[in-house]
Amino acid sequence: MDPREKTACFTGHRPEKLFPSDTETAAQVLEIRRSLHARILQAVDDGYTTFLCGMAQGVDLWAGDMVLSLQESVRQLKLVAVLPYPASVRGWPPEWQRSYLRVLKFCTEAVLICPGYQPDCYHQRNRYMVDHASRLIGVWREGCPGGTQYTVQYAEKKGLELDLILLP
């Protein structure tokens, strides 16, 4: 069996793009997280056992945390960190750095895409995840340019099943 059949990957905007007008509320974050958790649970119910996480602030790290919490009851789940380059967290707010390190510590495996920063290292990371999965789980504001839009479009082109939370 092709391992991609049981592998899903994540994409989603960073916090500042999730709530572009600084109107983030705890209720909005909770609703997105609930929807994301439901989609991960559905993937597990559908037989997915490996989850690829790009380890970015926001949706990626939320999803990574959720998979790790599910590992307590579903032992065969694997979380794979797909890192664009080693120092990708430099300059992040401390709370996101802590979240990154916590998730990375408990990942089953880590894949390093580039040995150092390169202009397209984030796109390379996103392509790697799509090329190694059969389902994309994400949070997307359609028309919002950036890595999430690129990843959704690339996944469509590659024929992945899309399970997206669409934001207004």
Regions inferred by a protein language model and the residue ranges of each:
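Acidic/glycine-enriched connector segments
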Residues: 1-168
